[in-house]
Amino acid sequence: MAKLVTIFGGSGFIGRYIARRMAKQGWRVRVAVRRPNEVLFVKTYGVVGQVEPILCNIRDDASVEEALNGADAAVNCVGI
């Protein structure tokens, strides 16, 4: 099974590049964002089901923990 990465801020300028690149390398990509319905375009970065946006509030520990659940790696592209 492909490894899973969670990318925080994966819909931003740098995050988009990283999400695309990791999908091309065969990773399953979870893009953690504030408004997943506004970034559905990230699904086009891979095959069906490979890249998924999820809701995450980085100021809430439980939300971050849920976003990281099962991930093999994490990338932070969020500026606070």
Positions of PLM-derived features:
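NAD(P)H-binding glycine-rich loop region in Rossmannoid oxidoreductase-like domains
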Residues: 36-80
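SDR active-site strand-loop-helix element
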Residues: 8, 32, 77-78
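Secondary-structure boundary/capping motif
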Residues: 2-4, 33, 71
